[in-house]
C-alpha cells in the first residue's frame, strides 16, 4: 500500500471519528484502537489507543474498551492531532456549511485566515459570527493591512498614507488585537499594500508588537528584488522586537535558483542577533500571481 493511500485512509478516519463523536454526545466515551499514534511532539509514532470523552482526549496508551463505549478500529492506520492550516484563504470561500467537510476530510481542524494583508471584517465581528454559528473547526485570524487601508483610505489608496491615516489604522489594529487578532498581515505585492511606505509599516508593526501580536508578510518581492524585500521585513523585526514571518518563502526567478542556502544563512544570522524570524513554504513551484 502506498503512503498516499495510508494518508488518505488516515484523513478519512479522522473525519469519520469527528463525525461520530459529534453525533454521539450521549455516549460515555469513544475509543480508537490499533492506530499508530503521532502525538505532534516530533517523537516517532507508536501503537496506542486513544480515548475521547465528548470533545476531550482523556487517555492515550494501552487501553481496553469500557462497557457501552464506542470503539473505532484503526489497525494499520495513522492517528494524529488535527492539522493546522497556518496559511489559509478559506475566508475567501463560503462559510455556509459550518461542518467544514472539505477541511475535515483532509484532517485539518484549525485554520489561520487574514493572510497576505486580506481580512474581510474586524476580529470582533469574525468572533461574533462564529459564536452565533459555530464551525466544526477552530479558527484564528490576522488583521489584514489591506483591510485597514480600505477602512481608512477607501478608494484613494494608490499612495502612501498620511500620518493621520496611519494613526487611524493603528487605532483599528489595536482594537483588533484586543479582540483576539494574532497580529498584522501584509501583502506588499498586491493592491493596496503595494503603495505603502516603510514608515507606515513600521508604525503598524510597533502597534502590533505593543499588543502582543505578530507580523506575517507576503513580501514586496519574491524574485528580482527579493533581498531588499527580506531586508525590509528583518528591519521591522529588529526595530520593534515583533516576531516576523515570511509567508511562502521562495526564489521566484530562475536567476536566483541555487541561492537558497545563502538566504537560509541570512535568516540564521538574523536569528543569532535576536530577530524572531521564521518562514513557511508550500510544496510546489508555482503561485497564484503567475498561474
Where are these regions (language model features)?
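Bacterial N-terminal signal peptides that target proteins for export
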Residues: 2-14
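Bacterial N-terminal signal peptides
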Residues: 12-23
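Boundary at the C-terminal end of the N-terminal hydrophobic targeting segment
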Residues: 24-28
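Histidine-rich, glycine-flanked metal-binding segment
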Residues: 37-82
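Solvent-exposed loop/turn segments at secondary-structure junctions
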Residues: 58, 78-79, 117-120, 145-148, ...
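Divalent-metal coordination cores built from histidine and acidic residues
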Residues: 74-79, 83-90, 96-186, 205-206, ...
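Short active-site segment of divalent metal-dependent hydrolases/proteases
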Residues: 90-91, 221
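Histidine/acidic residue-rich metal-binding segments in metalloenzymes
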Residues: 125, 161-187, 192-291
Amino acid at each position: 500500500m502506498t503512503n498516499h493511500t495510508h494518508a488518505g485512509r488516515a484523513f478519512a478516519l479522522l473525519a469519520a471519528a469527528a463525525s461520530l463523536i459529534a453525533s454521539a454526545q450521549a455516549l460515555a466515551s469513544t475509543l480508537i484502537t490499533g492506530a499508530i499514534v503521532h502525538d505532534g511532539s516530533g517523537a516517532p509514532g507508536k501503537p496506542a489507543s486513544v480515548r475521547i470523552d465528548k470533545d476531550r482526549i482523556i487517555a492515550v496508551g494501552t487501553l481496553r474498551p469500557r462497557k457501552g463505549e464506542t470503539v473505532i478500529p484503526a489497525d494499520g492506520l495513522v492517528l494524529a492531532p488535527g492539522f493546522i492550516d497556518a496559511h489559509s484563504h478559506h475566508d475567501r470561500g463560503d462559510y455556509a456549511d459550518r461542518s467544514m467537510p472539505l477541511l475535515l476530510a483532509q484532517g485539518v481542524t484549525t485554520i489561520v485566515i487574514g493572510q497576505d494583508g486580506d481580512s474581510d471584517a474586524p476580529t470582533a465581528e469574525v468572533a461574533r459570527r462564529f459564536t452565533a454559528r459555530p464551525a466544526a473547526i477552530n479558527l484564528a485570524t490576522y488583521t489584514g493591512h489591506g483591510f485597514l487601508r480600505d477602512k481608512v483610505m477607501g478608494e484613494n489608496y494608490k499612495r502612501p498614507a498620511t500620518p493621520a491615516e496611519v494613526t487611524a489604522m493603528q487605532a483599528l489594529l489595536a482594537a483588533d488585537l484586543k479582540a483576539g487578532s494574532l497580529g498584522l498581515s501584509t501583502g506588499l505585492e498586491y493592491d493596496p499594500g503595494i503603495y505603502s511606505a516603510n514608515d507606515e509599516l513600521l508604525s503598524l508593526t510597533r502597534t502590533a508588537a505593543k499588543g502582543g501580536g505578530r507580523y506575517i508578510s507576503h513580501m514586496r518581492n519574491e524574485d528580482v528584488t527579493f533581498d531588499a524585500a527580506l531586508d525590509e521585513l528583518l528591519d521591522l523585526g529588529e526595530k520593534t522586537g515583533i516576531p516576523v514571518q515570511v509567508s511562502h518563502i521562495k526564489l521566484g526567478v530562475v536567476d536566483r535558483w541555487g541561492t537558497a542556502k545563502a538566504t537560509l544563512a541570512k535568516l540564521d544570522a538574523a536569528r543569532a542577533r535576536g530577530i524572531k524570524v521564521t518562514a513557511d513554504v508550500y510544496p510546489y513551484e508555482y503561485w497564484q500571481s503567475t498561474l
